[in-house]
């Protein structure tokens, strides 16, 4: 079976969804920009040799509809012989795109793939056109489709206090701000055209949604967002609404060697699992354990973890049950997470994987895990190995 390697991994800045930098930039353009950038950064690859493009996106309608992957590829002027498909596993869509492409390479049906994902939550809100089947209430809790309430449930089950959530949320912003100030994000962000507050066109090379002035005290003043009477989850301890895209160039190890392209990481193992929709945020725990079992590794072998921070009340139980609470500041989300950067749904899997690979390089770590919860009760995880 072919070994699959990551040759390059990039992302756009994360733009604020409400009146932010990308308010006049379409999802296809964010995607096409990254596709072009990956090809220009890896000039040894002839674009005609790309076997397929896998692109994650959740709300596949309006500008994100009609196979946004193919639309973006055509905008990027990738040769027309290169096919493209759009993938949807809700929050895990672009990580699923990575898994789908990797398996294609593993079995020899492809050598080179572009993968990634996009979500413009300012143009296509996450609840746009959603119409759950009324019969679902006979098999799952009605609130299982309300992500904030599932976070409340998970937090209560694991005794996650409001103060713990606020501390974790403040940490996310502080670490993301430090990563910005220290230049750590420069290795993954591709400067992207957008508009400033006055409408002037400019290139953005920083994440717009980070709030450097966030403190535990300022978060403590916020009201519960989903359960106004007994809730602990607030807007401040939830992932921000943002617009963005992320992308990776992956190929067989043998093709990377023949092209003379540097290998940044190898995919060691992958997993996806289901769990109770009422606690959908717990999915990273069984997904990580299954991926590690397939990799022949243990939790102690992993030097870095990236967990998508859908909610602090959701992330902390996962960190606890993975035995990482005592190592959180050495191993978990060292550059912050979605609470600070936002969670553009279809983008996030490739985004956290890109951040993880950059951290693995900067800290000389051999093994890393990127893992995410998924709405309606799923989890997805990828084990990366530096080579």
From Swiss-Prot:
The active site is at residues 91, 343, 373. The keyword Cytoplasm applies. It holds the Pfam family Thiolase_C. It is an enzyme of class 2 (transferase). InterPro entries: FadA (IPR012805), Thiolase (IPR002155), Thiolase-like (IPR016039), Thiolase-like_sf_Thiolase (IPR050215), Thiolase_acyl_enz_int_AS (IPR020615), Thiolase_AS (IPR020610), Thiolase_C (IPR020617), Thiolase_CS (IPR020613). Pathway: Lipid metabolism; fatty acid beta-oxidation. Keywords: Acyltransferase, Cytoplasm, Fatty acid metabolism, Lipid degradation, Lipid metabolism, Transferase. GO terms for cellular component: cytoplasm. It catalyses: an acyl-CoA + acetyl-CoA = a 3-oxoacyl-CoA + CoA. SUPFAM superfamilies: Thiolase-like. GO terms for molecular function: acetyl-CoA C-acyltransferase activity. One of its GO terms (biological process) is fatty acid beta-oxidation. It comes from the Bacteria. HAMAP family: FadA. Heterotetramer of two alpha chains (FadB) and two beta chains (FadA). NCBIfam families: AcCoA-C-Actrans, fadA, PRK08947.1. Belongs to the thiolase-like superfamily. Thiolase family. This is 3-ketoacyl-CoA thiolase. It comes from Pectobacterium carotovorum subsp. carotovorum (strain PC1). The gene is fadA.
């Amino acid at each position: 079976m072919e070994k699959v390697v990551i040759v390059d991994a990039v992302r756009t800045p994360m733009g604020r969804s409400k009146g932010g930098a990308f308010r006049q930039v379409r999802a296809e353009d964010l995607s096409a920009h990254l596709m072009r950038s990956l090809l220009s950064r890896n000039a040894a690859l002839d674009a005609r040799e790309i076997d397929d493009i896998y692109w994650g996106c959740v709300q596949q309608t309006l500008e994100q509809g009609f196979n946004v992957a193919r639309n973006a590829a055509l905008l990027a002027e990738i040769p027309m012989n290169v096919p493209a498909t759009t993938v949807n596993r809700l929050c895990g869509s672009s990580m699923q795109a990575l898994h789908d492409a990797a398996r294609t390479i593993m079995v020899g049906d492809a050598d080179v793939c572009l993968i990634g994902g996009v979500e413009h939550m300012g143009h296509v809100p996450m609840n746009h056109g959603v119409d759950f089947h009324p019969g679902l209430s006979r098999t799952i809790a009605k609130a299982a489709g309300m992500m904030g309430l599932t976070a409340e449930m998970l937090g209560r089950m694991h005794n996650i206090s409001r103060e713990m959530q606020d501390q974790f949320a403040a940490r996310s912003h502080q670490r993301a701000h430090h990563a910005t100030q220290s230049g750590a994000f420069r290795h993954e962000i591709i400067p992207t055209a957008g508009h400033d507050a006055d409408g002037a066109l400019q290139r953005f090379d920083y994440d717009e949604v980070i709030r450097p002035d966030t403190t535990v005290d300022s978060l403590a003043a916020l009201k519960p967002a989903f359960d106004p009477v007994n809730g602990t989850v607030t807007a401040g301890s939830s992932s921000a609404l943002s617009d963005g895209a992320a992308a990776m160039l992956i190929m067989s190890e043998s093709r990377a060697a023949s092209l003379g392209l540097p290998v940044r990481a190898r995919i060691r193992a992958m997993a996806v699992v289901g769990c109770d929709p009422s606690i959908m945020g717990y999915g990273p725990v069984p997904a990580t354990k299954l991926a590690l079992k397939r990799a022949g590794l243990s939790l102690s072998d992993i030097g870095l973890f990236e967990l998508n921070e859908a909610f602090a009340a959701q992330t902390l139980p996962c960190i606890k049950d993975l035995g990482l609470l005592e190592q959180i500041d050495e191993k978990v989300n060292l550059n912050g997470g979605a609470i600070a950067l936002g969670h553009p749904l279809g983008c996030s899997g490739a985004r956290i994987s890109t951040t993880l690979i950059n951290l693995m390089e900067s800290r000389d770590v051999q093994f890393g895990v990127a893992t995410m919860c998924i709405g309606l009760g799923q989890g997805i995880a990828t084990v990366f190995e530096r080579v």
